[in-house]
């Protein structure tokens, strides 16, 4: 995979870890903005975008852009303590940067790009470890409105059905749930414990980017821990017509 890195200061030094990777690192200067760097990276056929640290509002905007259109996925670091805090912080950054004006719209865009949150902690002994792996599950908006008022004969019945639709509308407008989250992996008493399975959509996306060896190991992991058994897609075979199939069309004329 080709790595495309955007940083405010060079500190990742990934070429020491991945010397054989195609890596392009860029940082903003006084004359070249970070947005210009990101626009250039979109045209360089990158597979993974890495944002060094989302510490300012403009950098949060870069992260959202790169996660939506520029690569297979985006990695970034943030200092939020909980997953809801992460969503709120990124949403507020998008609003302050002027990218969005509405809180719900900004939050909806944020949760669409947050697939997994790998939360690291450092205890008082100086030990650093992964505390949890959390999956973000966007909640799709469903059309729950009905036309039952047409079936009502009386005005009171029609008004009651109308108020039901109005209640649904105001609930979606004022208190709509945009996402759910659940821990996939947790660190408990010195051991890592699998708590919830990965959603079907993310499993499918992950399998589509694996080679045969990784796919076998991943499928075995799913079946062993969560009882999820998946069948690999069969190779496409073009069907050949069976022998003796009658041809459509007019019958040939008989000659005497």
Predicted regions and their residues:
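Acidic-enriched, low-complexity/disordered segments with a strong bias for Aspartate over Glutamate
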Residues: 36-39, 45, 57, 85, ...
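A broadly conserved detector of short glycine/acidic/proline-rich loop/turn motifs that flank catalytic sites
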Residues: 9-10, 30, 55, 122-124, ...
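Phosphate-binding/switch region of NTP-binding enzymes
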Residues: 107-144
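NTP-binding/hydrolysis catalytic cores, primarily Walker-type P-loop NTPases
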Residues: 132-256
